[in-house]
Amino acid sequence: MIPRDSYEIIDTLIKQGRSFAIWRIPGEDRLHFRMQSAGSPCLLYDIKDLNERSGFVIAPFQVTAERPIVLIQPDCFEIPSESDWDFSREKNEFPSNEIEIPSESEEKERYAYHFSLFTSPLLKGSQDKLVLSRSKTIRKDPSFSPGKAFFAAEERYIRSDVYLCHTPETGTWMGGTPEILLSGEKGDWQTVALAGTQSLRDGKLPKSWDHKNWREQQLVASYIRRQLSTLGITPEEKGPYSARAGEVSHLKSDFFFSLPNPEKLGDVLQLLHPTPAVCGLPKEEAYHFII
């Protein structure tokens, strides 16, 4: 059991440059922790290289020589206490370099420019879907605690996978998502098609969805069926149904299937990533347009 007042230990592990991850799976109350105390994380340059490997994976949207997949190979499975770890040894792993913080108007102008680039192929019909993400740079408050932020997030977003991870190669990442790329064990596996967004109605899930949201979710569902079929897999399906994520809801379908060779998970991940929910369709054209 990981006590939820361990945020100071998490903050210290980050300052010391440790390679670790802490996360909570949707619907669970138990926190998971993995740390590699000996050696450096493994760097991989192709998703298929995850075949026959295990550990905590930190992967970029685009895998390159400069941005490889980082695999934490844990040898520690519990958060260390102050008594069994040298918490007096702290260092500033990343020098506090000054970075330029763009103004709100500059950020808005930059987003509007990229928005126009993305809408053009959609209006022409050369792309069915493109996902434009937004980044925002803010100045970190000196009192900000990554550990405290993680514990607050995992308590609030009980239906999401909430995580915090750190390595010297990647820096610190924290996030939460209701979308499962792939989950399971041994021969039984699951993925989801999650798309469409609607606000809750008086705290309740909506009972109806418009054509735009239905079409958006079906694009993702059809993609998953096609990708799995290339491996000869015909999954069992549940949905689509309304699923809550924070203060909004999405349309969700579950896909259940068996894998004759679970050690080849890298092959399955390469087929599924990136899904239309985070990239677009057609997959290859959308992927290369974004990068």
Language-model segment annotations:
Residues 2-6, 14-17:
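N-terminal accessory regions of nucleic-acid-interacting proteins
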Residues 8-10, 115:
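Glycine-rich, flexible loop motifs
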Residues 14-30, 34, 139-219:
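An anion-binding catalytic pocket shared by soluble metabolic enzymes
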Residues 27, 61-62, 75-76, 186, ...:
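A broadly conserved detector of short glycine/acidic/proline-rich loop/turn motifs that flank catalytic sites
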Residues 27-29, 35-139, 144, 231-233:
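Non-catalytic accessory segments adjacent to catalytic cores
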Residues 57, 125, 182, 222, ...:
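A residue-level signal for conserved active-site and pocket-lining positions in enzyme catalytic cores
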Residues 79-109, 115-116, 139, 192-290:
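Contiguous alpha-helical scaffold segments within structured protein domains
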Residues 131-136, 166-167, 240-244:
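Short, surface-exposed recognition loops or helix-turn segments adjacent to catalytic cores
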